[in-house]
Amino acid sequence: VKNIPSGVNVLDGNVILPKSRIWTYQQGFNKGGLSGYSCEFRYKFLYEYGGLFVDTDIVLLKDFNLDKPYIFISELNEVGNVIATNGLIYSQSGTSSEKIWSDALDDISYRNKARLIHGEVGPILLNSLVNKHKLKKYVLQPNLFCSIGWFETEKLIDGTQLPNDAIGIHLCDAKSKLNDIDKKTFPHVSIIEQLKRKYL
């Protein structure tokens, strides 16, 4: 891995899940994608260690406190329902948090991975487990991290502005690729360009 920022520790992912366990989607828009495996990896990481897991396509805009036993971000789906999503998850280490992650790992182990499609073991599974384990009080509102939905990624480049209370932004990389959004060419006023000026 190149261009690793200073202060970042690079560790061997085989400690969490061995390389032999890597799998990809075999169908759907994200065919060949690793995001399903990434979900399994994060659930195993949280089960074993607890802590904070953040996708690489989330940009943090402000500091925020990890002062609760869990933190889940949420998004609006296409019909306007708020659902927990797994782009950023915080789970305090300890036995009380292990059940939700063991349930997630059990669910994935029972699935036929050749038939899975994007989202099934990510937001869909996580949202059902948050409800099952009565953890909805730890779910942040969508505007804080996912003010732009995965189905409206054109807003990243059309001049749409982030809400003032946004803590971060999920760039929805898998869908951005699908929608042919080239993050190297974008209007000056776009969210992408503003992020570039601020952080690059």
Predicted regions and their residues:
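Glycosyltransferase-associated regions of secretory-pathway enzymes
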Residues: 1-39, 54-200
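Small-residue hinge/turn detector
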Residues: 39-51
